[in-house]
Amino acid sequence: MGAVDTMEVFFEKLNTGDRAGAVALMDEKVEMRIHVGDNARTLRGVEQVGGWFLRAEAGLKMVPGEVRDLGITYQADVLTVRPGALSQHLDASFRVEAGKITSINLAPR
């Protein structure tokens, strides 16, 4: 499965409430970098990164908009929607190797 195929399955599972299924698409050594303001936080390993998605509010949706397929890298403008919160556009980059997500980078637009 290529990056685009893997990410389509990831977003489908995440947005239909199958968070565990979405997390199963992550490599054991996945890393995620989240940018907030002038700061960034890095999570390492499927326990930390997967846990971030598993603990997110019920109803979290991440909807990819403009997608750029760069081989093993999938980049997209992602609309994030959470109940009771303002929606947010993120610049998102996902690296996929052998059908597993190995790296995630999320930054506000």
Where on the chain are the PLM-derived regions?
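C-terminal and inter-domain tail/linker signature
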Residues: 1-109
